[in-house]
């Protein structure tokens, strides 16, 4: 194991010690559980240090650490840091460095750490679930504005969140949202738990976490769900034993060190705040240019599509008399062969909620041929748009 992996393992051991002392249940993430159970090597990715706790236990852990803080350790959450982007905790070794230069505000203590994600219960009502999900997504997008959705609803939700931040203060709003999530996501008697990550949501039956057991990971005794097979099957599928860790390459924007602390890095970087502002400004420009590129590509694809339609319509215009003659003689087998390119273009047009009907006579013949040859699926789709 390298020094960064050893730091993560030591943090996991400390979390285990705190949980055992305060009788708090926790579970290694599916990735770490797989490493422990199947003997796979410890992950290279410094962001793979993850444990799971039920929402109530996660809050108890936060309070326990706040009451008895440790030297060179920090526990961050939305309760303590106004730019913390999600509903989870991060237990950090402050004598190390793990900094994403594109998101320098994410953590107040950007060292190597272990993320503690909550196992949420479903919210009591659908209405409350929608409202809470809306506010949580708006907060996350506000923290990572360069990667936020640009649709109208997301913009409105972010605007409402900004107004709330102006009224209560950003830190007050973050803490208030955290408290709401803690209250809403620990309903008694739940039959399932939801693990919500930034890009993935996984649902586990409640019985998986009914009991726990001890396993050994790189010589350290840690805790996992007793039903490890079911736990890993839900996460990786039936062939979880064959799951391999993808080859890890440190991203260009990520600075990681187990020897240098983030405070030393800041000092040696000179005016770090100015550097961060410039980098964020450049990231914003890059995100904007990517959106423009995506829009341009979409427009160009549509231009090419319209060109294909036009060329095909000219081709069928030249065959119009031939098609009418085949239709008059009820030669539907030949017509089906003639209309194959027309069928493909109609499929593309229907995907864009449109019709390929440049010539009304040919279109009417085509629709009748669909009925006669039994292609009722496309015929019904056309019928809904006529």
Where in the sequence are the language-model features?
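Alpha-helical junction/boundary sensor with strong preference for TPR arrays
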Residues: 306, 346-350
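Alpha-helical repeat scaffolds
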Residues: 299-303, 334-345, 376-386
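Active-site nucleotide-donor binding segment shared across nucleotidyl transfer reactions
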Residues: 16-49, 53-59, 207
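Conserved catalytic core of two-metal-ion nucleotidyltransferases
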Residues: 1-20, 62-134, 138-235, 242-281
